Amino acid sequence: MKTFWAFRETLTRNELIEPLFAIFHTALEARGMFARKGQMLDATFVEVARQRNSREDKATIKAGGVPEEWKDQPQKARQKDVDARWTKKHGERYYGDKNQVKVDSRSKLIEDFTVTAASVPDRHALEALIAEGDPVTYVNSASTGERCEKISAERNVQAKPIERAYRNKPLNGSQQRNNRARSKIRVRVEHVFATMRMCLRSAWNRCIGMTRNRATIAMTNLVYNMVRFEQIERLGLKNWRVA
């Protein structure tokens, strides 16, 4: 375990994990592993050790600062995560970061990703993840609104969100049919997250700070792509032609 930790620390210090992800992505691309018939955007929480701070310290951290008393206690400061944030989803509270990914809908390989604090809404990742000429993109109901539509239009990408019902404004029949069709495709991204959680234990990180957590999440995404590539090759799952 210490050997792996030291190896990961070396990669993190030299900012090499994300370049390694890009190199492997290029190798996958050269072998036609991305079908480019469609892609899915979604996010999963990566929890970290919960902090025990006073109200004053919490307010300082939330404002982007570091409590004064920590500056004289470097050992204590090293054990404090000032980057992770709290958020709430479906009645459950999470503390940590968020792995926001762009996944090829046919191969289920990760094309790109960005790491944010858990409190950052999914729609904020849209700008970082979609690129000019991307295929039709299936996004969740959080990635809607004028700003998201503008980004998609500027990059010539057709975004297909899961439409949301509002009070006194239920979905009509056409919207419900669209949601069912889109959900059948988008559910494949949950297979990616399930593999990460069960096989790579990605739901929780022991690292402190965004730099180390981003590196750990990047490594998880890289290892997932390696595992998925081996699975596609071994089982002969590649039945598409690159668009």
Where are these regions (language model features)?
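Composition- and surface-driven signal marking solvent-exposed, interaction-prone regions
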Residues: 115-116, 149, 207-211, 233-241
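Helix-centered, glycine/charged polyanion-binding patches within enzymatic domains
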Residues: 62-64, 131, 135-136, 141-218
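Polybasic low-complexity intrinsically disordered regions
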Residues: 1-154
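Amphipathic alpha-helical protein-protein interaction segments
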Residues: 47, 220-222, 226
